[in-house]
Amino acid sequence: MNTLSKSSLSYCGAELRRHDHDRFLTCLFAPATRREALYALYTFNLEVARTAEVVSEPMIGQIRLQWWRDAVAEIYEGRPRQHQVVQPLAEAVQAHSLTRSHFARLIDGREQDLDSDPPEDLAALEGYAEATGASLVRLALEILGVTRSAGEAAFAAGRHVGIAWALTGLLRAVPFHAQQKRLYLPVDVCARRDVSPGDLFELRSSPELARATEEIAVSAEAHLVEAYKLRHQVPAVARPALLLATLAGGYLKTLRRAAFDPFAPAVQADAPGRAWRLTWAALRRRF
């Protein structure tokens, strides 16, 4: 793994290091020739993912997402905008022939962040996780040189890793979303576990919330298990995009040790020894 000083990082690299350190660390295990493209892709994701946080009303959020749809369209038309993320993203798209539909699916998935209604059920939540998480992993795999003919196992594993990572992130973000009066816990899960959104929005943990959290965590763990089953079929070049599985597994174990209380300080903290954990997984040729 390469350690990089802040001064040596590009704009996208610096943004990723500051705002999505987990993904930044996984990039350091990618070949140097692919790293800037990963930085650009993941920083694009940052820009799209923070939409609901930086706008005051859904209509403005829709305008922001449309800006990114148009920016991606212009990249594929060969006339990228002058923008500090769009330009390097355009270089990544051109250099690695990235599939346009995955960008569209990711942006469309983020529209759900602007909807005040929670997902109806776990299937709907997993659909959101697949659109926003798995699509991003798929693009990262393309940057790393995974091809359709040789990479079916990698793409299948990537789908499971992307969903697991997104679900894990949503569970860890329950307090943050509650402060914004946003709820991602499915309606049917909340009803089944007697979770009161009112209590949640007052930032109160409860046994009922823990049971709902556990149900979603078990789903995330199941996706990791499915990804792990494919380990020996995944080409080595794909592993940097799948290393998030190592971190997701660690976060889920912490959540389990905290009795599935998303408000527990340990759950909110960054995983200790993240870099070493990733290094150990990479040395063992795992993810």
Set out the residue ranges of the language-model regions.
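Acidic/His metal-coordination segments adjacent to aromatic residues that form catalytic metal sites
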Residues: E111-A124, S205
